[in-house]
Amino acid sequence: MSNNSSAETEAPETTGGDGPLLDLTDAGVKKFIKQAKARGYVTMDELNKVLPSEEVSPDAIEDTLAMLSEMGVNVVEAEEDAENAEGGEVATRDENTTVIASDKPAAYDRTDDPVRMYLREMGSVELLSREGEIAIAKRIEAGRDTMIRGLCESALTFEAIMVWREELGTGRILLREVIDLEGTYAAINGVAAQPAAEDDEGPAEPVDDEAGEAKAEGAEGEDEDDFDDGAGPTVSAMEGELREGVMAILDAIASEFEAFRKLQDKLVGSRLKGEDLSDADRKAYEGLSATIIQHLKTLKLNNNRIEALVEQLYAINKRLIGLEGRLLRLADSYGISRGEFLKAYFGSELNPTWSEQVKAMGVRWTKFVENDSQSVTDIRSEIAALATETGVPIDDYRRIVQTVQKGEREARQAKKEMVEANLRLVISIAKKYTNRGLQFLDLIQEGNIGLMKAVDKFEYRRGYKFSTYATWWIRQAITRSIADQARTIRIPVHMIETINKIVRTSRQMLHEIGREPTPEELAEKLAMPLEKVRKVLKIAKEPISLETPIGDEEDSHLGDFIEDKNAILPIDAAIQSNLRETTTRVLASLTPREERVLRMRFGIGMNTDHTLEEVGQQFSVTRERIRQIEAKALRKLKHPSRSRKLRSFLDS
């Protein structure tokens, strides 16, 4: 009994519809919590059995997970996950410690609710400590350094850098397109630079952990444009300050690369002759390589540029694999196994006497190099051309590709772990922006995009926690997506900011004067042209569907009550129909010739009216005769017996 009471006292109160879903007064739930605390974990299947069967909100599920976390209970996907987390110790349970399953539907064991499934997967990942964040950040940095170290051994990298140097000098590209401005600024100046004060460069850098977390918690009532631009230098200011130093580094790389390229060409030429570099040249080669790598680490290339270099490296590697595959298939046609071929081929890619050497390995090899000598020669010539293009021997190039792939793989895995460990942060921020035009899952996805960008930008040496820094990127991604996607008719971000400014001012003036301010008062308060205020207020109105139900019965729609300016009113249609019938009867009282002339002259019952000349041609008479017939017919119509039938239409 004491244990049950302690479980109740340690667990937070759950009152209200938005609290955790566990009823702490239920005996089954009490026993469930007691056993979960004793084990230190609970599986998602066990948790689903004690959750209520009715529809639950994502907020309530998140609060329940948070409550269990505060009680020291980890939520894992399955028993195996808990055993692995405890270092392989098997968690034993006997019949007495088995969780009593409640009489809830078994549907919760297998759910198709995407939010619940997402939260279930998210709950299986443990949160990171400050030390864990630093360890992962170091792994990301190490993976990136490994990639750069591999790229620096390829002449293609430096040829691309020389092109960038020339384009920077002529002004065809900007410095921000080549390097990571913030990282290079910090490396050259020896201080942690604040994020650049520009929309696309990133949100503001938090002052400290507590302040950042407090702002994150208070983000619920904020508008889409409430980002602090920070006090860091602008992008233009950074470029102006860094340009001279960056160009000096690029000049140094250019001068060192000239000597390095000569050594690379010498190395490839030696391998083509079956020789190798001398000890002095090898030492100079390694020294220049280390110096250039250090220069590039100081520059901190833009991620897009690194990706372009990696793609270039992989493209050549794909060509190399294709050539080697063709050579392997030729050898296979002569009964040479893959293992035999690779053993004889690796290390001798550029050996000019390779064909003669493999003849000594047997009859199959002799037939292979003699019968397909032209194909073998052509393929090996193309492979040698690739070595000349890359500036390194093929075996070294293959090692470079493996080094870059290893660094990329390690960095990607570390980033994945950092992202998965902070998915709860995205949930906590995204739920503050619900009911703003985007569904909850869409908000989560946009927040995850911001989280991934924060992982790329995070600098652990600055001293603050990752969650504090990532909050700003997540909020920015969510609010930008709301501005871009929430409205049926997209409004630009700068106009969204103007709308928010007017809405805030209108709300403030409502408290001051006790009524909604007029456009004139808003224009005066904001020092903004009246016409612009009117246009913004018009744009700010949300569109409404014509299919919106009207009334309690919902049997009519808004579109039923909107006037169609182009439609003919029923009364007008009736008048027109009656006028047509009356006119026909009145004209029928004339002679057929007079009726025909009037109908043609005034276009009654026809597409258009006709001139006297046209009517005369129809009756084979002169214009004057037609005019006389028309005048006589009109005099007859003026007689009261006929005119009174038409006069009522004239009055109406």
Swiss-Prot record:
Residues 197-211, 219-229 have a biased composition (Acidic residues). InterPro entries: RNA_pol_sigma-70_dom, RNA_pol_sigma70, RNA_pol_sigma70_r1_2, RNA_pol_sigma70_r2, RNA_pol_sigma70_r3, RNA_pol_sigma70_r4, RNA_pol_sigma_70_non-ess, RNA_pol_sigma_70_r1_1. Residues 612-631 bind DNA. Residues 497-573 are annotated as: Sigma-70 factor domain-3. Disulfide bonds: none annotated. Residues 1-24, 194-236 are annotated as: Disordered. It is found in: Cytoplasm. Keywords: Cytoplasm, DNA-binding, Sigma factor, Transcription, Transcription regulation. Its main location: cytoplasm. Residues 418-488 are annotated as: Sigma-70 factor domain-2. Pfam families: Sigma70_ner, Sigma70_r1_1, Sigma70_r1_2, Sigma70_r2, Sigma70_r3, Sigma70_r4. A motif (Interaction with polymerase core subunit RpoC) lies at residues 442-445. GO terms for molecular function: DNA binding; sigma factor activity. One of its GO terms (cellular component) is cytoplasm. Residues 586-639 are annotated as: Sigma-70 factor domain-4. GO terms for biological process: DNA-templated transcription initiation. Belongs to the sigma-70 factor family. RpoD/SigA subfamily. Sigma factors are initiation factors that promote the attachment of RNA polymerase to specific initiation sites and are then released. This sigma factor is the primary sigma factor during exponential growth. Interacts transiently with the RNA polymerase catalytic core. This is RNA polymerase sigma factor RpoD.
